[in-house]
Amino acid sequence: VNIPEFKVRVFKEDEPIHETRVIVGKTHTQTPIFTDEMEEIVFRPNWYVPNSIKQNEIAPYLRRGGGFFSSGWDTSVLRRQGLRIRGANGRDIDPDRIDWSRNDIRRYELYQPPGPRNVLGLVKFRFPNTHDVYLHDTTQKNLFSNPVRAFSHGCVRVQNPDKLATVLLGHDQDWSAARVSSAMHNGADANKVFIKNRIPVYLTYFTAVADENGELKQYKDLYGHDRRMIAALNGRPIPAGLPDNVTASSGGGERRVSRRSRRGDNPFAGIFDF
């Protein structure tokens, strides 16, 4: 994956055999740069909500209104998005039976079972890592038409996940496109297919790349990594975490738009773009 290019490529013996568009993390929820090995492909996966999203995006909304069993807790939004809550005993819990003003949401497992609303779509590609980042399908196919595709919480969404799965499992286990399609659309839920020969995965950040014809292609410094590196080499370091178009000065000029004004009145709209 080359983050600034919004592309993923598969190489076999140093030759590219497949490429497709991807969506990467926003400037404030960046896709990390690291290397790991793909261990499994999961068809019709569950989505387990990360603690960061539980605590920062879901909990504040659930706690509105105060008292126990208060109608101010609009837990119906969980049901509309197909989210379920599971306790320590492994059983699902009615969210209306929880005092959200007293209980830490991180104590509970929030998950979205397989289905048409699942934010991971029909397949995910796992390479277990400390960042909890992976490649996956998405229900928001329309976003792939954007030239700048930084919309996720850090994971990488793949435009043609069926073709990617066919390339990888075809090489590893002789799977056909028809078998992949069947697993995605008609197969068992949470069906894990383990990779026999682990596949190296590189999440990279190259803003200048030579194409197959030797022509130089340049891409925007999406996360400002190049800018910070140049500044550090010139003896004027810039704080980490600033995107490419934001300076370290306090002069302002950057226009900030609240999530509510950008996404309407649905406070959960920002969650389901994982």
Language-model segments: which ranges?
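Well-ordered beta-sheet/strand-loop patches within structured domains
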Residues: V1-F274
